[in-house]
């Protein structure tokens, strides 16, 4: 198990194999992840505690889904998305193992660009 500090909070990687990865993302209230998509990575998100808004789709037609404890969303490759913490929130993420597959479209912390395989 390892902890990775992020500008929006931290993540704990609790499982990492050649076939899947399990993480807990702790996002501090008022913080947001980058607007991003993945070319290959597929992930399922479940809110463990707290509330967040999940933005889905391109900026000109974004859907905002309020997610609370127990809510689940499946993110397919190519889906533009961003998590925004309404309160401190813990999100369980289970995904395919392509952790560096991130295409950032917008980032308030200055991490613009692509980390795609």
Which residues does each PLM region occupy?
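A short glycine-rich, His/Asp/Glu-containing loop-to-beta-strand
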Residues: 1-41
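Glycine- and acidic-residue-biased ligand/ion/polar-headgroup-sensing regions
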Residues: 40-58
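Double-stranded beta-helix
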Residues: 2-6, 84-117
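Short glycine/proline-enriched turns and hinge-like loops at secondary-structure junctions
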Residues: 37-39, 46-47, 66, 85-87
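Short acidic-glycine-tyrosine-enriched beta hairpin
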Residues: 58-78
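Short hydrophobic/aromatic-rich beta-strand segments that constitute the beta-sheet cores
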Residues: 34, 54-56, 93
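Histidine-centered metal-chelating micro-motifs
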Residues: 32-34, 38, 71-82
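Short, surface-exposed secondary-structure edge patches
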Residues: 24, 44, 64-65
